[in-house]
From Swiss-Prot:
The keyword Transmembrane applies. It is a multi-pass membrane protein. The keyword S-adenosyl-L-methionine does not apply. It comes from Mycobacterium leprae (strain TN). It comes from the Bacteria. Residues 367-380 have a biased composition (Basic residues). GO terms for molecular function: membrane insertase activity. This is Membrane protein insertase YidC. The lineage of its organism: Bacteria, Bacillati, Actinomycetota, Actinomycetes, Mycobacteriales. Interacts with the Sec translocase complex via SecD. Specifically interacts with transmembrane segments of nascent integral membrane proteins during membrane integration.
Length: 380
C-alpha cells in the first residue's frame, strides 16, 4: 500500500489542498453514513464546493461591487469611447484615470471566477485518480488490484476502495454515462443505472445554471443591458452555458455534475444575499445623508443666519450686539438694526477739534460721547 508522493514541479500544489478538503468532509459524513455510502461521497463533493466558495466570499463581494460600479460608470465610459474611440492610447489612459478616481480595479472582479478554475481542474483530476485502470493522459495504466492498493493523494488505499464501491442503484459516483473502459474497477456498475441517475443530475445542473445567469442579468442596469457586447454575453450565459452543461454531462463523472450543480446553487443564494446586503448599505447611506441635511436645515419660521466676513461695525467702541438702550437694557439684534449707525472716522487733530472743557467737543460733526453718557437710539 502506498500514497502518491508530493511533486513540487507539478500541479500537486492544487491537487493536495483540494483532496484534503474533500477528505475532511468525507470522514465526517462517513462516520454517520458509512465509508462506502454514495451520499457520504456526494456530500463531501458538495461541501468541498461550499468550503471553497466560503473562502472566496470577500473576493465575491468585491466582484459584485466592481460590477455595480462598472454599470454606474457606463455613461461616462461610452462618452470616452465616443470621444477617444480612434485614439486607443488616449482611451486607455482616460480609462485608467477614471478607474483611479473611483477606486476600483476590473481585474479584481474576475478573481472568484479565475480562482475556481484550478479548483475544478484539481477536483476533476482527483476524481479521475481514483480509477487508474483506464490509463489516458497523465494517468498510469494499473490493474484493478494495483489501483486498489495505491492511495490517491491524501486518500488512503482503503479510501480508494470505498470510493469505487460507493454507488446508487448500481451507479458509481466516479462513473460517467458514456464510459467504455475501466469498468472492472467498480464493484458494481450498471449503465442504465448511471444514465438513470445522471440525466436528472444533468437537468438540475442545467436549470441551476440558467436561473443563476438569469438572476445576474436581472440585476444589471438598463444602460448596461443596452450595450451590444453585454447583450451578447447575457445571451451566452442565459442559453449557451446551461445547454453546454446538459450536452457535456454524459462525458463527465457523476461527481463533477454534482460539483457543477452545487456551485450554481451556492452562487444563486450567495448572490441574492450579497446584493440585498449592498442595497441595504446604500439605503442606509442615503438615509444618513437625509438625516444630516434635516439636522442642518433651519427651523420652520426662522431667519437664515449670515456670517459676516468683515469686522463688526461699532460706534465709539460699542458693537451692534452690545448696545445699551436708554433704560439700561441690552438691545436685541432687531432693535440694533433700527439704529442709524455712523462709522467713526479718524481725522487730523486740529486746535478746533480739541474740547474747550472736559466732556464736551466744539466740533459739531464729532460723535465722541461725554464721560458717563449713554448711547441713544435714533428713531427711523
Amino acid at each position: 500500500m502506498s500514497l502518491l508522493p508530493f511533486d513540487f514541479v507539478s500541479l500537486d500544489i492544487v491537487y493536495y489542498p483540494v483532496s484534503w478538503i474533500m477528505w475532511v468532509w468525507y470522514k465526517l459524513f462517513a462516520a454517520v453514513l458509512g465509508p462506502s455510502n454514495f451520499f457520504a461521497w456526494a456530500l463531501s463533493v458538495m461541501f468541498l464546493v461550499f468550503t471553497l466558495r466560503a473562502l472566496l466570499y470577500k473576493p465575491f463581494v468585491r466582484q459584485i461591487r466592481t460590477t455595480r460600479q462598472m454599470q454606474e460608470l457606463q455613461p461616462r465610459i461610452r462618452a470616452l469611447q465616443r470621444k477617444y474611440g480612434k485614439d486607443r492610447q488616449r482611451m486607455a489612459l482616460e480609462m485608467q484615470k477614471l478607474q483611479r478616481e473611483h477606486g476600483f480595479n476590473p481585474i479584481l472582479g474576475c478573481l472568484p471566477m479565475l480562482a475556481q478554475i484550478p479548483v475544478f481542474l484539481g477536483l476533476y483530476h482527483a476524481l479521475r485518480s481514483f480509477n487508474r485502470t483506464t490509463g489516458g493522459f497523465g494517468q498510469p495504466h494499473m490493474s484493478v488490484t494495483e489501483n486498489r492498493m495505491t492511495g490517491n493523494y491524501v486518500f488512503t488505499p482503503v479510501d480508494v476502495g470505498h470510493f469505487l464501491d460507493a454507488n446508487l442503484w448500481g451507479a458509481p459516483i466516479g462513473a460517467y454515462m458514456t464510459q467504455r473502459s475501466g469498468l472492472d474497477a467498480f464493484i458494481d456498475f450498471s449503465r442504465p443505472a448511471v444514465i438513470l441517475v445522471g440525466i436528472p443530475m444533468m437537468v438540475l445542473a442545467g436549470v441551476a445554471t440558467y436561473f443563476n445567469s438569469r438572476a445576474s442579468i436581472a440585476r444589471q442596469s438598463a444602460e448596461a443591458a443596452e450595450n451590444p457586447q453585454t447583450a451578447l454575453m447575457n445571451k451566452i450565459a442565459l442559453y449557451v452555458f446551461p445547454f453546454g452543461v446538459v450536452v457535456g454531462g454524459p462525458f463527465l463523472p457523476l461527481a463533477i455534475i454534482l460539483y457543477w450543480f452545487s456551485n450554481n446553487i451556492w452562487t444563486f443564494g450567495q448572490q441574492h444575499y450579497v446584493f440585498s446586503m449592498i442595497e441595504k448599505e446604500d439605503e442606509a447611506k442615503k438615509q444618513k445623508a437625509i438625516e444630516r441635511r434635516t439636522a442642518n436645515a433651519p427651523a420652520p419660521g426662522s431667519k437664515p443666519k449670515y456670517v459676516s466676513t468683515t469686522a463688526p461695525v461699532s460706534v465709539n467702541g460699542f458693537s451692534k450686539d452690545t448696545m445699551i438702550s436708554d433704560d439700561g437694557a441690552k438691545l436685541g439684534s432687531q432693535e440694533a438694526d433700527s439704529i442709524d449707525w455712523v462709522t467713526e472716522t479718524k481725522t487730523a487733530t486740529t486746535p478746533a477739534d480739541k474740547p474747550d472743557c472736559v466732556g464736551y467737543n466744539n466740533n459739531p460733526t464729532s460723535h465722541t460721547r461725554r464721560s458717563g453718557q449713554r448711547t441713544k437710539r435714533r428713531k427711523r
